[in-house]
Amino acid sequence: MAPKAEKKPASKAPAEKKPAAKKTASTDGAKKRTKARKETYSSYIYKVLKQTHPDTGISQKAMSIMNSFVNDIFERIATEASKLAAYNKKSTISAREIQTAVRLILPGELAKHAVSEGTRAVTKYSSASS
């Protein structure tokens, strides 16, 4: 009978290998993969916050909530404007459809302020581009 192998003290299990990082330049000519960019309104929300309350900060969680809010309102207005364009047998959403959608979605005084600010922004854009 063969002698038993010596027992070694238990050591840490070998660490699991992490998947290899994306190659920057490979020899087979494959293109480098870039990280998918996440588009948010964070920078714009931050600029507006600093205009209204210069000494106030915002947490990452609050910024995430604000970003979700802006995306939600944008989607609601776009959907309503799309329906309005379809009702009028038009294939293009114009400023008029957006304005009507805002009036339908936002309540009372908030809609009035949004429409006046939107009109001001469109006027400013039109005068700057021409």
Curated annotation (Swiss-Prot):
GO terms for molecular function: DNA binding; protein heterodimerization activity; structural constituent of chromatin. The modification N6-acetyllysine is found at K7, K8, K12, K17. The keyword tRNA-binding does not apply. Keywords: Acetylation, Chromosome, DNA-binding, Isopeptide bond, Nucleosome core, Nucleus, Phosphoprotein, Ubl conjugation. The keyword Glycosyltransferase does not apply. It is found in: Nucleus; Chromosome. Residues 1-38 are annotated as: Disordered. There is a cross-link at K124 (Glycyl lysine isopeptide (Lys-Gly) (interchain with G-Cter in ubiquitin)). The modification Phosphoserine is found at S11. Residues 1-19 have a biased composition (Basic and acidic residues). Belongs to the histone H2B family. The nucleosome is a histone octamer containing two molecules each of H2A, H2B, H3 and H4 assembled in one H3-H4 heterotetramer and two H2A-H2B heterodimers. The octamer wraps approximately 147 bp of DNA. This is Histone H2B.1. It comes from Candida albicans (strain SC5314 / ATCC MYA-2876) (Yeast). The gene is HTB1.
